[in-house]
């Protein structure tokens, strides 16, 4: 799955257009992209259900709410944050926290993570 990193919302939009034109239908828009929430909202409006969009580098429950409200269907976080998993699940979306050690993976799984991303 492509992880979108860009220097601006405009650059991010251009990258998504290129990926979609190439047949990619699932992508993660990271919160490191300036205007990431607005970009998610614009992409959801433009592409509707043609793209499965998620938010990445999400580190707190406020970002979970903002990105899901903007159209994210899944939430990826760089580490296991219980409140991120809980809020994502509460809102009915897929939670994918990052973890590295076996203990972190098991802890995330037991907390309700749908998937665990081995990271870094």
Please annotate each region the language model reported:
Residues 1-74, 90:
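Conserved N-terminal beta1-alpha1 strand-loop-helix module at the mouth
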Residues 35, 50, 59-120:
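Conserved anion-binding
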């Amino acid at each position: 799955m492509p992880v979108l990193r860009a220097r601006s919302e405009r650059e991010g939009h251009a990258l998504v257009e290129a990926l979609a034109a190439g047949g990619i239908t699932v992508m993660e828009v990271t919160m490191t992209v300036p205007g990431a929430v607005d970009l998610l909202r614009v992409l959801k409006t433009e592409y509707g259900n043609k793209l499965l969009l998620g938010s990445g580098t999400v580190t707190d429950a406020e970002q979970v709410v903002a990105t899901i409200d903007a159209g994210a269907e899944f939430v990826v976080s760089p580490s296991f944050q219980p409140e991120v998993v809980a809020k994502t699940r509460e809102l009915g979306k897929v939670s994918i926290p990052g973890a590295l050690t076996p203990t972190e993976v098991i802890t995330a799984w037991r907390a309700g993570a749908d998937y665990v991303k081995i990271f870094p």
